[in-house]
Amino acid sequence: MKKNNIPVTICEQKFGEFAKKMTRGFGKIERNFIEHMLLGMSKSQSVLLTEIARNSINDVSIKKSSERLSRQLGKFDSEKLEKNRMDLTTEILPEHKLFLVDDSEVVKPCAKKMEFLEYVRDGSDDGKLKPGYHLSEIVAVDKNRQPVSVFSRLYSVAETRFESANTVTQQAISKVVKTIGNGLFVFDRGYDDAKLFEFLEKKKQKYIIRATSKRDVLCKNGVFNIENVARSLKGKFSFQIKFQSGLKENLKASYTQIRLPKMPTTPLNMVVVYGFSKEESKPFYVLTNLKINSKEECINVVRAYLYRWKIEEYFKFKKQAYDFEKMRLQSIKALKNLNLFLTTVITFLAILGNTPLKKDLLILAQPCHPKVKFEYYRLLAGFCILARELQLRLQKPPPKSDRHIPKQRDLFYYLRYQKRFQSA
């Protein structure tokens, strides 16, 4: 037996189980559509419909196949698929859940006819305004310490029923709490808004929000700017944190209790951290409703906030590994559905990362460095190697007893007739 045969068999079983659970509750036509989208996108590492069609082994031309996928994306009802995905995602989350919230953008600088196209700030180009769409995302940290999406929505402020970005964020949090449960929500300083604080308190959720320098807070002696309060806290606790680039030492943190002017009856803790800025005297500060009574609890707040960088890595992977910003569809509904399918494909990688198969995938990827904290690139590389091996194996002529079976020979064909292949 070849050395990769066992991982190939396990991988096809995992993908078959995943596809079966994702298509639960759908009819035959929709099941085939979902299966071909998931497999084609996984193998091609692209959101281009021509590439997805090219990686679905059948007798239909690429042109007709991509046109069919485009039509189905424009009319597909995503609610059931999202529910099935969330059910699987919940299984790989730890008991104490950490949710990371952030927004990104999908830039389409050359697009002209895409529906509800608007101007967004391109974060990779000094915030310049370019045509595109907004992307709201909440990821959870799974048992493998990798980010897995629990909410993803592509939207435009030009849409007919659009209200505000705050509304999208609040709807996202409400949906996550309803489907998964309570957890600790982490936000960057772009979310420093009194409305969000009030909403999270109303929902009885724990949170950590990085504050901006414009924030005013209530202390014992009155209302002060948060920077002035931070300067009075010189860093009571010393600690160090290990990053991918090495050990970060000489870090200091302090905390104090404050209140917000618009929430004078709600006590919050302000944690001030020194050592991350090039200017040693310049700290950053986060506000949280977590209880802090010791050095350990104070440092844990800092560590939880620093997990926020995982969502930045997630956005980077989503755009680079699958060419997400190269999507070419006119309908806003089709674009939203394409985003959901890509999120589902990445969810499958997260599931693989929580199985014993993870070790084989990382070995197959032949990494240059022994260990990284963000594993999706390696998991994807290993999966694609196994998928190509499986495709070559399936292209061999079938045994005589199976010649009456239709010509289409893809992974799902193999899974449906797996017993016949094994007996032959």
Which residues make up each language-model segment?
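Short, charged amphipathic recognition helices of the HTH superfamily
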Residues: 44-54
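Short amphipathic alpha-helical segments
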Residues: 35, 49-50, 66-67
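Short, basic interhelical loop/turn and adjoining N-cap
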Residues: 56-68
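Active-site-proximal, Lys/Arg-enriched surface segment
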Residues: 66-143, 254-258
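Single, function-defining residue in the core of a domain
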Residues: 1-46, 95-97, 110-112, 141-424
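Polybasic, low-complexity association/targeting segments
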Residues: 53-56, 268
